[in-house]
Structure formats: structure tokens, C-alpha cells
Amino acid sequence: MKKNIIALLLIMTLPAMAADEFTLYELLPPETHSFAITYDVTATREGAPFFFNPIRPGSVSTKERVIERSTGKELKFEVVSGKDAKATGWVQPETPDKAEFIKVYLPGPVPKGGETRIRIFKTYTDAVSYTLKDGQLVFTRPLGIKRNVVVLPKGWELIECASPGIVSIDPDGRIRVSFLNDRDDQLPVKIVARRLP
């Protein structure tokens, strides 16, 4: 029985190890309605000179920074409209003109069979997704990436999680909730927390 459980756990982790995209959400004090995002992704489209990371509608993005993960080198980027992104030919033609993207300048075009691993740092402010309600922290956000981690601010404890997640504690005492989105659509995440006494 114990061997079966271990085998099942190993099988369940295989997609997570094989998956490439990963997003870390570090919730800042809820009064700020802000959370720091670290997004790891690999550009694999042959010949691509850029990588376009959409800025979610309703969120205000600040403190952007991009590095190449293999070297740690800072990469040039700019925020562009959907119209400007479409003009490059590297985003879908049906992208709305008013959409916003972080346009990352890759070190060189992605070679055939190659890749460029990048890490995007940004801070979102979004009072709809992240707020303080009746003294409780509420984070509600659909997550489309396969692997996601949400870290609560220090001094808060989890009291509700609407989607299956693995709860653990960081070395600094912050609570983290890890999600594996095995769906073909977005995982509806809702986290509620309260201040520790």
C-alpha cells in the first residue's frame, strides 16, 4: 500500500517537473492591493526576437525587470500596446489594440531547436483581485499557468482555499500555497487569510 502511494505521488509530480512556466505571487500588505510576481518562461518560437508577456486587464504593472535565466543578464524591455505588438507579427492578429504587453528584447533570435529562458519580475496593483474585506485578506484570481505559488504576507494565516493546493511554510515564516493547474482552462483560485493573533 505504501509503495502504491509513493508511486502515485511520483506520477503526479511528473507534469510539474516537465512543465516550463512557473509563476510566484508574493502578496504585499493587503491595504496596498499589490502583489509581486516572478514569472519564469522559456521562449521557444524559432526566429523570435521578442517575447511578449501580457499585462492582465484591470491590473497596473510597475517595477518591471527582466533577466535571462542562464546568465542573470538584464534584458531590455518596454511596455507596448496590443496594436504595436501585432505590428511585429509575433502576437495573434485578434489581439485587442488596447491590450498591454511587456515586450522583452531577447539576446538574439531563438535558434531552430533552441530556447531562451527568461524571468520577468513585476508588481501588480489590482483592487479587484486582492483586497481586505471585513479584516480578512482575499486574493481571487484565475491562474492559467500550470505551476503557481501564492505566498501570504508575513503575519497572516490561511483560513480558506477554494482550489486544491499544497500548503507549506517558508523559512521566514510566510505561508505558501502551491497550485498545479491540470486543467485545459484557468484554475479559479480564491484565498482567504486572517492576521495571526
Language model segments and positions:
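Early extracytoplasmic/domain-onset interaction patches
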Residues: 19-53
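Residue-level recognition of well-ordered beta-strand positions that form the cores
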Residues: 38-42, 53, 119-123, 151, ...
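Solvent-exposed beta-hairpin/edge-strand motifs
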Residues: 49-89, 140-164
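Solvent-exposed loop and beta-edge segments used for protein-protein assembly and interaction
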Residues: 29-35, 44-46, 58, 96-98, ...
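A surface-exposed beta-strand-loop module
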Residues: 63-66, 70-137, 171-197
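Sec-dependent N-terminal signal peptides
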Residues: 4-14
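Hydrophobic/aromatic beta-strand elements that line small-molecule binding cavities or substrate pockets
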Residues: 39, 108, 148
